[in-house]
């Protein structure tokens, strides 16, 4: 068993040839303004109760009006810590931390603290970043993103493993046997590359615990998954998916940006196909602002989630639903 597989939430969220479902947060309105924190907490708790496996947030340090209307972005670690106090089992994920803009020491301490506070529920998506205006603001050489990403990942793994790791790279060095005072429970937190992160698939397979990709044409995703899952050791694959959930459960599929407009029965059949080709987790992003989040969470919870339960719950109900 790998260090990642010892992590309780990793096991609860990911298993070979099985799919689970999560949600993208924060929850927002039609103008992409996030709801009040009390509402975020209530909806997160509801998602936890009905069997969603994860809540994922993005990390964008800066905003520019040139981006247009985008969802409100809070500091991911602070926001997830808040949600952790209002939920019990659901995974708390990042999609994704811009690893190149954060010092590894700060990352190591923040992630360790959140994983311990939440009872080992953190799933750490990591990215190189794609907003070009952020790199000069942080004095980051955009030509060195690949190397910076690699060294950040390696530094985190070392700092989680030992109170006095030996680290001496282009980013920083440690002296006088220094390190974190408190380590993660399993001396590791599951990490997932987002996209290629300017790496090769071979590097990602070797150094990361899984892969977070993007929605793309089904046959393209199928081919990518065949290549990803070709090794003997399981590492999960996941991606977000925008869903404009029609109130008609039988509404047929219509493409939208990053996903589909469809009814719940069509969604269920589509998700079964994603599971069949090897997708292990999908984070749904609800974009229908004519319906309440409560309504959509409850509908998916009643009619779709039972086919894609978190794995601890699947064991308890293994004689129930026939998949």
Each language-model region and where it sits:
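Catalytic domains of carbohydrate-active enzymes, especially glycoside hydrolases
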Residues: 41-58, 203-214, 273-280
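An alpha-helical appendage that flanks or caps ligand/catalytic pockets
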Residues: 1-17, 143-187, 214-323
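Conserved, mostly hydrophobic/aromatic
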Residues: 59, 83, 114, 124, ...
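Short, acidic/polar
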Residues: 34-47, 110, 193-203, 262-274
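N-terminal beta1-alpha1-beta2 module of alpha/beta enzyme domains
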Residues: 1-86, 189, 287-290, 299, ...
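Flexible, glycine-rich active-site loops centered on histidine and acidic residues
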Residues: 16-35, 99-168, 290
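Active-site mouth loops of central-metabolism enzymes
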Residues: 25-37, 97-105, 187-196, 251-265
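Hydrophobic faces of well-ordered beta-strands that scaffold small-molecule active sites
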Residues: 21-25, 55-57, 92-94, 122-126, ...
């Amino acid at each position: 068993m790998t260090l990642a597989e010892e992590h309780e939430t990793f096991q609860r969220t990911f298993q070979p040839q099985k799919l689970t479902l999560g949600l993208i947060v924060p929850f927002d309105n039609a103008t992409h303004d996030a709801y009040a924190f009390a509402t975020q907490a209530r909806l997160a708790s509801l998602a936890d109760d009905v069997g969603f496996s994860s809540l994922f947030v993005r990390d964008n340090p800066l905003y520019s009006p040139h981006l247009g209307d985008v969802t409100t972005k809070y500091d991911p670690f602070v926001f997830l810590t808040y949600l952790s106090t209002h939920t019990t089992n659901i995974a708390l994920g990042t999609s994704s931390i811009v690893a190149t803009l954060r010092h590894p020491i700060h990352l190591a301490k923040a992630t360790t603290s959140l994983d311990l506070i939440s009872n080992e529920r953190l799933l750490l998506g990591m990215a190189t970043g794609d907003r070009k205006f952020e790199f000069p603001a942080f004095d980051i050489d955009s030509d060195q993103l690949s190397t910076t990403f690699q060294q950040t990942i390696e530094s985190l793994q070392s700092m989680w493993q030992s109170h006095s790791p030996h680290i001496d790279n282009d980013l920083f060095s440690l002296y006088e046997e220094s390190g974190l005072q408190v380590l993660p429970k399993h001396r590791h937190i599951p990490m997932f590359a987002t996209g290629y992160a300017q790496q090769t698939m071979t590097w990602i397979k070797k150094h990361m615990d899984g892969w977070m990709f993007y929605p793309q044409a089904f046959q393209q995703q199928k081919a990518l998954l065949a290549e990803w899952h070709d090794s003997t050791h399981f590492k999960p694959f996941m991606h977000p998916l925008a869903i404009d959930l029609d109130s008609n459960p039988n509404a047929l599929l219509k493409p939208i940006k990053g996903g589909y407009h469809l009814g719940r029965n069509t969604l269920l059949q589509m998700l079964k196909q994603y599971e069949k080709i090897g997708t292990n987790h999908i984070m749904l992003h609800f974009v229908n602002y004519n319906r309440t989040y409560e309504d959509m969470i409850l509908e998916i919870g009643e009619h779709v989630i039972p086919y894609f339960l978190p794995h601890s719950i699947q064991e308890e109900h293994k004689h129930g639903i026939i998949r």
